[in-house]
Amino acid sequence: MSDTQKKIDLATVITELEKACAEKPDSVFVHHQLGLVYRQAGRVDDAVRELSKAIELDDQSVESLINLGAIFFDKGDVDRALELNERALKVTPNMAEAHVNIGLIRQRQNLIDEAIESYTRATQIIPDLVTAWINLTSALTMKEEDEKAVEAARQAVTIEPDSAMARNNLAVALYFKGDFEESKKNVEKARELGYPIDDRFAQALEEKLGHS
């Protein structure tokens, strides 16, 4: 499907949902769906308005809280994003997605221990949630806990062998652990899957292989 066709289809969906909102102004579901489609169309302010309306109608609408939090995270407002995800957890404490989001927020704030705690909680709730393992790998690498980073990365690759990001993160974790040959194999796999390998990392790995 062409980009033009996608825009036409989105415009059609938006028109239909706007009509539904006018007909059912108290429908949490319709406001939520319209917010998601606005976001997809790049109409961020409209998305914020509709998701906020959904939450106003139902302050326990966890999906609206999560999605509104994601918008604020993308905008760089991590405090608002954190507040919304924490509100979601008060409603549904075992919502793995919210724990992952809070981990991302903590990681952006350079609060690595807190990030690791949130990602770990997410993996306990949903053991095959690949995004949690991928992000946990990244946080453990930042903390220089290389053995644990490799373990987390292997979990991600086991769950989703064709995840380019999981392969890249495993390559990085193996590099810092000193397993350069296996790191190289995962770099090649990540590149094959379309991941844009950092040139500096690739060069550093080649230098290590040249001296090993």
What are these regions (language model features)?
Residues S2-T4, V172-F176, I197-S212:
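TPR/TPR-like alpha-solenoid helical repeat scaffolds
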Residues F29-Q40, E63-D74, E97-Q107, V130-T141, ...:
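Conserved alpha-helical positions within TPR/SEL1-like repeat arrays
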Residues Q5-K19, A41-K53, K75-R87, R108-R121, ...:
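Structural signature of tandem alpha-helical TPR/SEL1-like repeats
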Residues V130-E192, P196:
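Ankyrin-repeat and related helical/solenoid repeat scaffolds used for protein-protein interactions
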Residues T12, E16-E23, F29-V37:
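N-terminal coiled-coil initiation/transition segments in long coiled-coil scaffolds
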Residues D26, Q60, N94, D128, ...:
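Short coil loop/turn residues that delineate tetratricopeptide repeat
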Residues D58-I125, T131:
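A generic tandem-repeat structural signature
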